[in-house]
Amino acid sequence: MEVLMAERANLVFHNKAIDGTAIKRLISRLIDHFGMAYTSHILDQVKTLGFQQATATSISLGIDDLLTIPSKGWLVQDAEQQSLILEKHYHYGNVHAVEKLRQSIEIWYATSEYLRQEMNLNFRMTEPFNPVHIMSFSGARGNTSQVHQLVGMRGLMSDPQGQMIDLPIQSNLREGLSLTEYIISCYGARKGVVDTAVRTSDAGYLTRRLVEVVQHIVVRRTDCGTARGISVSPRNGMMPERIFIQTFIGRVLADNIYMGLRCIAIRNQDIGIGLANRFITFRTQTISIRTPFTCRSTSWICRLCYGRSPTHGDLVELGEAVGIIAGQSIGEPGTQLTLRTFHTGGVFTGGTAEHVRAPSNGKIKFNEDLVHPIRTRHGHPAFLCYIDLYVTIKSQDIIHNVTIPPKSFLLVQNDQYVESEQVIAEIRAGAYTLNFKEKVRKHIYSDSEGEMHWSTDVYHAPEFTYSNVHLLPKTSHLWILSGSSCRSSIVPFSLHKDQDQMNVHSLSVKRRYISSPSVNNDQVKHKFFSSDFSGKKESGIPDYSELNRSICTGHCNLIYSTILYKNSDLLAKRRRNKFIIPFQSIQEREKELMTQSAISIEIPINGIFRRNSVFAYFDDPQYRKKSSGITKYGAIGVHSIVKKEDLIEYRGVKEFKPKYQTKVDRFFFIPEEVYILPESSSLMVRNNSIIGVDTQIALNTRSRVGGLVRVERKKKKMELKIFSGDIHFPGETDKISRHSDILIPPGTVKTNSKESKKVKNWIYIQRITPTKKKYFVLVRPVIIYEIANGINLETLFPQDLLQEKDNLKLRVVNYILYGTGKPIRGISDTSIQLVRTCLVLNWDQDKKSSSIEEARAAFVEISTNGLIRDFLRINLVKFHISYIGRKRNDPSGSEPISNNGSDRTNINPFYPIYSKTRVQQSLKQNQGTISTLLNINKECQSLIILSSSNCFQMDPFNDVKHHNVIKESIKRDPIIPIRNSLGPLGTALQIANFYLFYHLNLITHNQISVTKYSKLYNLKQTFQVLKYYLMDENGRIVNPDPCSNSVLNPFNLNWYFLHHNYCESFFTIISLGQFICENLCMAKNGPHLKSGQVIIVHIDSVVIRSAKPYLATPGATVHGHYGEILYEGNTLVTFIYEKSRSGDITQGLPKVEQVLEVRSIDSISINLEKRVEGWNECITRILGIPWGFLIGTELTIVQSRISLVNKIQKVYRSQGVQIHNRHIEIIVRQITSKVLVSEDGMSNVFSPGELIGLLRAERTGRALEEAICYGAILLGITRASLNTQSFISEASFQETTRVLAKAALRGRIDWLKGLKENVVLGGMIPVGTGFKGLVQGSRQHKNIPLKTKKKNLFEGEFRDRDILFHHRELFDSCISKNLYDTSEQSFIGFNDS
């Protein structure tokens, strides 16, 4: 007792707080001194003491203890101000979305961090014993980050994927959150709850895979005799002492350690805490230690390479299953990685760059030759310096020198005046932050619809040569030129051409769907469209453009053209007087069937149409039937329209059928099957018998439907009809059945003696009397056809915008081609057309134009740009016009000169249609200019309507001197109605001449006129340039491919024109097609407000089509073609950028898994690949080819192993989980132990592409005395599990059938060396006690001598087995330069004795 007391008296009294590390050290020293039992007793006392003190202190937390920080208000305000400026820059197109996101994250992150520092200071000054303050630094639960959320601001949140939400939460939990902030907060909170569940299962699966990889690794030998080691230096200070000691303790030395001449530790000695501390104190040379990496065995490990057992502190026992222990040691904390998510609750943590600030006010000077301009990652202009840059700041008499380190950004210009503490440079964060970075793709979507346009050359990525993915070689803007578009695939042709002024009413349509009445096809069919003309007589306002369902075509040419679809086999057929246009229905287009229907235009041979003559017809496929039957249209009167003039008109047209015009809305079709058989054929069914489907009727005929059979014998043939339907035997009281051949509408009650029921559909009742006088009634189904009024052929012929006289009208009439009650026969498989839709020509007969009696029509063929188009021209003819002046070859002469005197030539651009278009519909109720755009995507082109809301006119040639009253009023209200001004797009009067003029000179004159405008020479007002193109800033003109239409709409009243004199105030030279950014100063009167493209240059004003710029930096991928039409929400650009991952827990487990499964290269920094390439070149240059392979592979493997261990350790350490390196090393050794055979020099042993173990490859090379070419490969843990020596182990992991089948085919042998194979087969597992028997069996094979004939390939040059270590200098230099991310380096170099 006295001895103990005396010892106590000698003990030193430590007065300092004990944290977790100190407790650990204390416990280990206690165990060393007193042993286990006594230590546990002491620890119990310590625990009791702790609980007593905590009870006595009784820290409680009240809401009053949460003190908010006074400076928060202005800090947040400042950050908001910065964000606002940033938003403006983005809007102007100065920064792109990624730069904006990055900067806004950094602004808020910095604010939040600053608040956090303020919080600590604030507490220390105001209330150092505040319980919140005490708790946050106690190290128990809660940390500054959480307290900061309570009293500072929550800041930026991560979403479930670890990405940033760029809307910060400005409130803290004490103040309370707004609704938006609450919802964003829920992301982080949700992660804590959900992850706990989900990630636990993930961690379990990770453990399973890890154990699978290493289950066969058992300690089987004491020493493998390796001479290699991994060298660790305690001197370089890169590693914290704690981690250094943790790396060392329990390892075995691979070499003697000398201190001067004195040996302080010998090879194969294990390192305890005393020795480790001695190494640190002496700062000895690099220490070479043995690790599982250096063990020479392939499928097991030796005691010395493994080191001490973690359980009892001695060298590991033979037969210990260290593989399984390693797998569980790494997998098990995975659950901890997950369960700790609630630490920061999803709050984002990242890093910001360091800044260099100016020491005082003054002018800054530096050498401009040493810097070159660059964009920072926030999109700001800056200078990058490659070497140390010396900057002088000169105030009145003091000169300050500042050195800026290399690779920094200089944020000021030369000779600029800087203020004290202004940020002048930004130091790039060092290489160690790379570990938290990853490559991310960010898609930018367009905010508005319009055409895409870019202002620089773009390249095709090699793998996307034929698609619409382009890579940008330099920074440039992408513009979306606005225009609202209409997308429709309903009607496949239109009659408008580029630049036409058109009345959009002619395209205004509604979609209507009518369900298909046919039984077998219940798809919804589109009715093409019913016109949306509303000007009926009831409205009382006669509007010529909305005449009731008629289309005025006046004197202008009505032009038709060939239509080409995406399937080019649908060509219009042209005969002498007939023109057939193929036409695809929706279903056909979806199924890509050949078209079945067409629109035919027939012209009388003499080319003259009279009034009411049929001009075109269309056979609608929905009125087409395969089966025979009878049409009925009720008792409503029917009259024929076949009159005399029609007979004259059809002179020479061969097929002429009577056509019946129905006044009814619907008609009925009663189907029946008809078979016409030769008289001699023998029937297999009786008359009036009832048969089922597919019954044999005659020799080669089977019935297609079931029903009642009626046979009629006629001259030389027999007619056999099958009526489907129900047979009904009427009672005496049944009155309905007395009638025959009647139609009964739905809802009529059909009575019977036994049952009475309502009829659901229309039925047809037919009375049938067989020979035995007993009659019965056949109830037959009826198909109803609703004839929709006016199928939309009329919408193909747009109304004329300008001509009001001599209106030519087209009436749509539906004819039923068969009379009521007449049987219709279908011959074999041809289908029967029941209804034909015709267009009947008509024109007004008012007083003025009473003389018009006929219209001339002709087909005209015009070849433009190598495309041949067929046009149809119709002109109304007055009798007093003579035809004498026609020239044969003159294209303009083939048409009579009409009354208004302007001779329109055939090249007149009114309503022609380019080939390859589809009919689009526009839903805008206004007029516009149509424009054809490039659109490679032929499937669904679109109309673009460029309405006045998308354009604005501004006047750059403003002079302050010329202000007058009107100018002032314009300033107050900039919208002047278009009617008061003859602006470039308001010139409806000049349109006739103008069209002719521009269309003949497509592009040539415009360039000249534009340059003249831009220099403002005296050109006349009438010289309008309305040709619309996509022109880029380099002055190239793109002539758009005529693949889609767009409508530029100039006639609304909200364009504004500012008219006054131009003078010398004109600064910017404006050229056509130029793009103008927002707030660009074009004239003295200040910046102009919107961004856009100049489409019209006037003498005193310009018209700008509004456009939105998007900035794109080099390496970005552009989706879409130049001039393609994009809709809102389409992907525009994809940026690939490096971004910091949030350091939150959620990243822990996936990160470990990503490293172990060797997933994508995203997480590898961009510089690393370059470093590896450089290293390879350097090696092969020094050593030559064969050595290069060997050493390259060897080093790559060593290097990747060290790097993987560091990465995994980093994740675990960041979570406070401590795992001994050797566990990770065992796993990593397994996933890096294979190489890939690269060339077939060894074809007699290994095939190229085969995976073999590294050691096996080396041994085979030595034995065969040949060099094997192989490269290192990293297998993920899953692949490594499926590439083992044992197929039983593989099959029990996953893909069982595949593994077993392959093993059977290859005749694989399983030597049952691992644990799992033996467990599966019920044998004794070769670990622990079962290990002894295994060893005894293998001893006898040990001493067989191996004889080699020749000297080894390697021995000639280097005697030692491991040649690479003779290149020690090369090795160290390369490694130190190239291969290391020196963050927390556990190992440096690579050593051999």
From Swiss-Prot:
Q: What is this protein called?
A: DNA-directed RNA polymerase subunit beta''
**What the protein does?**
DNA-dependent RNA polymerase catalyzes the transcription of DNA into RNA using the four ribonucleoside triphosphates as substrates.
Name any cofactors this protein relies on. Zn(2+)
- Record GO biological process: DNA-templated transcription
* Coiled-coil annotated residue ranges, if any: none
User: Which reactions is this enzyme annotated as catalysing?
Assistant: RNA(n) + a ribonucleoside 5'-triphosphate = RNA(n+1) + diphosphate
The gene it comes from is rpoC2
Quaternary structure annotation from Swiss-Prot or TrEMBL: In plastids the minimal PEP RNA polymerase catalytic core is composed of four subunits: alpha, beta, beta', and beta''. When a (nuclear-encoded) sigma factor is associated with the core the holoenzyme is formed, which can initiate transcription.
Q: Which GO terms describe its cellular component?
A: chloroplast; DNA-directed RNA polymerase complex; mitochondrion
Q: Where does Zn(2+) bind?
A: C224, C295, C302, C305
Q: What family is this?
A: Belongs to the RNA polymerase beta' chain family. RpoC2 subfamily.
The subcellular localization recorded is:
Plastid, Chloroplast
- Native organism: Manihot esculenta (Cassava)
Keywords carried by this UniProt record: Chloroplast, DNA-directed RNA polymerase, Metal-binding, Nucleotidyltransferase, Plastid, Transcription, Transferase, Zinc
Matching PANTHER family, A to Z? DNA-DIRECTED RNA POLYMERASE SUBUNIT BETA
Q: Which NCBIfam families match?
A: rpoC2_cyan (TIGR02388)
> Which HAMAP family does its entry note?
RNApol_bact_RpoC2
Q: Name one Pfam family in it.
A: RNA_pol_Rpb1_4
The Enzyme Commission number assigned here is 2.7.7.6
